[in-house]
Structures are given as structure tokens and as C-alpha cells.
Amino acid sequence: MKVSLMAAKAKNGVIGCGPHIPWSAKGEQLLFKALTYNQWLLVGRKTFESMGALPNRKYAVVTRSAWTADNDNVIVFPSIEEAMYGLAELTDHVIVSGGGEIYRETLPMASTLHISTIDIEPEGDVFFPNIPNTFEVVFEQHFSSNINYCYQIWQKG
């Protein structure tokens, strides 16, 4: 199963401040919506609760709590390992979509990274992990918006 990570991060690596994204770059979330349409997303519970279930997507939510979802498009798993095992039976591609701990644990499994770097350095308490030098940028596009950003695709070498 192919594992991709998709994230928007600030220049200082911040991806969140509590349950919130500390910016709103017009147009950037359209990339997320387009690339995740009809895909399986792997997220942590806090990320899922903050973003909610977008239509036409299926979710594998990882949580250590007794949390359950009242949604046919959501499957809850107690660990990333169990989620990956279960997803391998359901799909050939999963997009990891946060939060910070989930990104850190799945980065070694990923072959592709979809990263939007937002031209801002906000305060925050959740960070995207450093990208290992085993990845290289294979595509890059800059966008002018209310807050400029750069979308990159990284491939593992």
C-alpha cells in the first residue's frame, strides 16, 4: 500500500496551535480537497475532530481513547500499526493528514509528501517533522494569495 503524507506547514514548521491552524491562506485548502477526493485519509482523533468529515472521503482515525465515530465513512483504530494493517485490506493508497504525532510516526512509511509551506512564522505547539534527506523535491509551484505559499511534492529516493 502506498503511503503519502499531506500537510500545510509554516516556514517555522508549525502546523497547529492547539486544535487550530494558525493561518488561512486562500486557495491552499483547495489543494487538499482536490488531492484527497475519494481517498482514504489516516488522521489522529484530535485532527479529525477539528476538521470534521469532508464528503467523498473515508477516514481511518487513530486514538488511544474509547472514542467512537457515528459515521459509516470512519473506521477507528487503536494504533497506527493496526490502521495500516486494516487499510491494506481496503485500499492501495492512504493519505496521512495529521496531526503532528501521526506525521512523525508515519513519515518513515511514506513514499510521497505533499507539502504546502505557508509564508508565515506563527506561534504554535504542533510541528511537522523534519523531512529526511532520503526525500527530494520533484515538483514545486508558488502561489500568490493573501498569504503566499509554495506547494511541493517530495519523493523518497
UniProtKB/Swiss-Prot annotation:
Output the SUPFAM superfamilies linked to this UniProt entry.
Dihydrofolate reductase-like
Q: Which UniProt keywords apply?
A: Antibiotic resistance, Methotrexate resistance, NADP, One-carbon metabolism, Oxidoreductase, Plasmid, Trimethoprim resistance
Could you tell me one molecular function GO term of this UniProt entry?
Answer: dihydrofolate reductase activity
Report the InterPro entries cross-referenced here.
DHFR, DHFR-like_dom_sf, DHFR_CS, DHFR_dom
Q: Name the domain of life.
A: Bacteria
Q: Which residues form the DHFR domain?
A: 2-156
Instruction: Respond yes or no to whether keyword Chloroplast is given for this record.
Output: no
Q: Pathway it acts in?
A: Cofactor biosynthesis; tetrahydrofolate biosynthesis; 5,6,7,8-tetrahydrofolate from 7,8-dihydrofolate: step 1/1
- Give one Pfam family: DHFR_1
Assigned GO CC terms: cytosol
Report the CDD domains cross-referenced here: DHFR
Question: PROSITE patterns annotated for this entry?
Answer: DHFR_1, DHFR_2
Q: Example GO biological process term?
A: dihydrofolate metabolic process
Catalytic activity of the protein: (6S)-5,6,7,8-tetrahydrofolate + NADP(+) = 7,8-dihydrofolate + NADPH + H(+)
Family indicated by similarity: Belongs to the dihydrofolate reductase family.
What else the UniProt entry mentions is: Confers trimethoprim resistance.
Tell me the subunit arrangement.
Homodimer.
Function summary: Key enzyme in folate metabolism. Catalyzes an essential reaction for de novo glycine and purine synthesis, and for DNA precursor synthesis.
- Protein known as: Dihydrofolate reductase type 5
Q: What is the lineage of its organism?
A: Bacteria, Pseudomonadati, Pseudomonadota, Gammaproteobacteria, Enterobacterales
